[in-house]
């Protein structure tokens, strides 16, 4: 699964922005990348919606400022206006497999769904 067309490139660029500590610390910047109907199943098993993710990142302060190492980023355009990305992350010794769906909207590409699954130890 790998496609590097313009839609996938844009989704990858935006995904990496969401993982940037400076972006994560800003509710406005995070909110600009999340679809109004965004939801996530986190590595903790918790279900998050757009409002709860923005609030959690804003309240995390320095905890959210640590570096997130990304590897194995791959993507494919499933249909016009819909991109699926898969990749792995490591942060503070925690590793997770990740999957994201990006949707093209009138305001640009927005993250619609995300799931993180911890690595088996």
Per-segment meaning from a language model:
Residues 1-32, 37-121:
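A beta-strand edge to alpha-helix "cap/lid" segment located at domain peripheries
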